């Protein structure tokens, strides 16, 4: 099956799994997805990310995170730049998102990173998604 936007598919799988109160979510693997998932883990939005062999391909098994009342930690996860409408931002235009509670994830010339880190390194790039 051909996907026109695999990152949006990954974000939708996470969103749907959390709404259904699933503990785990399986996502087909790629390097950019791994980078995004590692950032989500680093920022505390997911508990764990493991690589699972699926034949000759790798899948990612994401352990979703919930608060004490069984509400998802990720309140909103949204794709910003799409294949049909790319959104780029300069380092000076990167602002705190949702009073520094939310996170922008950017693809820069120095790799995939959060908006905070990109602002610190003074690099801009493509806004992949925002998470709150």
From Swiss-Prot:
The processes (GO biological process) annotated in the record are: translation
One Gene Ontology cellular component annotation? ribonucleoprotein complex
Highest taxon listed in the record's lineage: Bacteria
Residue spans making up a coiled coil are: none
The protein's UniProt keywords, in alphabetical order, are: Ribonucleoprotein, Ribosomal protein, RNA-binding, rRNA-binding
Q: What InterPro entries does the entry give?
A: Ribosomal_uS8, Ribosomal_uS8_CS, Ribosomal_uS8_sf
Q: Which GO terms describe its molecular function?
A: rRNA binding; structural constituent of ribosome
Q: Write down the PROSITE patterns for this protein, in alphabetical order.
A: RIBOSOMAL_S8
Looking up SUPFAM superfamilies in the UniProt record yields: Ribosomal protein S8
Q: What's its job? A: One of the primary rRNA binding proteins, it binds directly to 16S rRNA central domain where it helps coordinate assembly of the platform of the 30S subunit.
The similarity comment for this entry is:
Belongs to the universal ribosomal protein uS8 family.
Q: How does it assemble?
A: Part of the 30S ribosomal subunit. Contacts proteins S5 and S12.
Q: What is the protein name given in its UniProt record?
A: Small ribosomal subunit protein uS8
